[in-house]
Amino acid sequence: MKIKYLALVTVLCFVGCTNSHQKHRNSAQSVEQNKEVSYAKGFRINRFKYCTQLIVMNPWDSTNVLESYVLVDRNKKLPAHLPDGIVVRTPVERVAFSSSVHAGMWNRLNKAGLTVGVCEPEYFSNPVITQGLSDGRITDLGMATSINIEKLIAAAPEILVVSPFENTKRTEFEKVKLVVVKDASYMEESPLGRAEWIKFEAAFTNEDKLADHIFAKIEKNYNELCRKVATTTLRPTVFTEKKFGDIWYVAGGKSYLGRFLRDAGASYMWKDLNQSGSMPFTFEKVYAKAVMADYWLIKYNDKRGNMTYEGLKNEYQLYANFNAFRHKQVFAINTAKTPYYEAGPMEPDKVLADLVAVFHPELVPGYKPTYYFNLQKGN
């Protein structure tokens, strides 16, 4: 699935709402409690006596704040003095999403039923949302990069959750005066850091305790797997993806995927590529480095069926020369049949378990994969 991120937007209030969506610029209250965020680098939660402040750090300049939100109980009078930020009355009762990733978090919080609009509905598999789209309760807002403003106004969400994008603005939202919530979870480099953003989303629905419980379980499972991996010194080599046209995009060693591979006890062929983004390489350059690698991981999208070794070879004959192909050690995710992009960010423990089962099956005997399957077996 291709996830398209909505660009940075001008955040204003929703048409017809009260002054509760004004942006406050004073800090008369003192912080009563700083809620601990253990892994995520992109947000902070400050607890005050009468409100909660969410601070989203700028992913491209961590010394600066991208946006702040001040959450105030909708059933109480708005306090006279509030910390800096856009005021949102909670719990939020109507929400729209530009990405299925954020909707996946709300689903884990049992709040998918609050959805009134989504972008690119073909990427949503949650039955609550697909049924809502079918019966007209949820509006198809069009592409994430060009939202249908008229439909957005008609859907009347209190907030629109988006992924911020660097160096761009969306001025059409000035007309809508909608509270746009910028969730930058996709910029986190660690799997647990990305999953911890459920605490950020939960604050809008007053489900903080549930989010803490969910994340604690994920954290426990993930770290237990890491401890198992630490008991073995074997580090099989691995490379990822395949070429797109003439270009093969290779994830950096500091990337989200790179961290998964390290934690799963594999030696990523580009672990020394000191960046979190991807680099474009030619097939020849990838082949020269990865031809003898032990394993090959691929993500693809095919509604017709699962990829086979023969099918992979037919895509490009030279794929068959890789050692991992010859030894039938190619594992893949068919994103058309598994909700990897929708649910995977909130299931890093399951993704890690899949990878441990690939590289060190003796550590998880009898394990049944969730996302990654050998091409011989499919899912």
Predicted regions mapped to residue ranges:
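A ligand-binding cleft/hinge motif common to bilobed small-molecule-binding domains
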Residues: 165-175, 300-313
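Flexible, glycine-rich surface segments
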Residues: 221, 225-310
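Extracytoplasmic substrate-binding proteins
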Residues: 137, 148, 156-247, 271-272, ...
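A short, structured surface patch at a secondary-structure boundary
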Residues: 60-153, 160-165
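Extended, charge-rich intrinsically disordered regulatory tails
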Residues: 314-320, 324
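Bacterial Sec-dependent N-terminal signal peptides
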Residues: 1-25, 355
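Bacterial Sec-exported substrate-binding components of ABC uptake systems
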Residues: 17-103, 210-238, 339, 358, ...
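Short, structured coil segments at secondary-structure junctions
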Residues: 111, 176-179, 264, 326
